[in-house]
Amino acid sequence: MNSKKTCLRIAVNAAATVLACLAVAGTAAAQDIKARTMKFAFSLAADHPLGQGAQKFADLVAEKSGGKMKVSIYANAVLGGDSQNLSAVRGGTLDFTSMATGLLAGIDKRFMVFDLPFLFNDAREAYAVSDGPVAQRLLNGLSDHGLIGLGIWDLGFRNMTNSKRPIAQAQDLQGLKMRVIAAPVYIDMFKTLGANPVPMTFGEVYGALESKAIDGQDNPVGVILSAKFAEVQKYLSLTRHIYTGMPFLMSRKTWDSMSEPERKIILEAAAEAKAEERRISQAKEAVAIDDLRKVMQVNTLTPEAVERLRGAVKPVVDKFAGEIGPDVMQQVTAELAALRAKN
């Protein structure tokens, strides 16, 4: 009997010790999570999938930190355009931002691989490469430039709108003044197709379309809808010529100021928010097209027309493939070939 009591006492004491250790560990972890409010700014609308993803991220950070860590959302370029946001994040005066991959080409030319025309056939391919080893290596390299890459979110496949005519073939772009992202691939692609590319920040686009300073622009349908471009554009052509990913970027200064438990919260919240943002983006694409059909003339290109466009922009792809480098190009090509072989 005494032996049983002794064993029981030892077991109880051991359990108490374990619980005490866990409590101490939990207290230490809690102490490592400091109260802080961070800012997440971007150019798109709050009701766009990116905005909804940003809110999901903010909610997750608050939940996982017990309310200690907060993220304030600033949509619609209220703190500045993409270039200003990027500079602010690098400088540490802004904590988070997200923007098109093309805008990172000034930091690392290899990011241009994501902007090559007609590279991806569908979102499945785009997501696989965006989550793959090449993308991760490029994101990791941003730490040398004051940035932490937390993954690549989804903006979608770009389509063309304009106020003049439907775009069914390259010739239809002749002479059109088309707003483009201030990125080399976009500028050269539209030049090659006969348009006059006009680099412009996103916040300026609606006003330029309204005043007829430009004839058209290109964006995924979700952006076209949320930005209300249908109010100032008549034609939507579903060209799907470039897929645009949105790297989710964090200031390295903010990251370096964090404890390991805080970093863990950020990484977990970013991964969960990315999955949610992509889900919302995919769900909204078909709905957005249906909504835009009610207020715009929408045309879909034939497969033959798409192939002709692909052929027309091949010199652009070849040119920038050289700048991106054979290593990245070969790896991305291999990733896509492996994916397509599974179909």
Language-model region placement:
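N-terminal secretory/targeting leader peptides
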Residues: 2, 13-16, 31-125, 133-134, ...
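Sec-dependent signal peptide hydrophobic core
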Residues: 11-19, 23
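Sec/Tat signal peptide C-region and signal peptidase I cleavage site
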Residues: 24-30
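N-terminal secretory signal peptides that target proteins for export/translocation
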Residues: 1-9
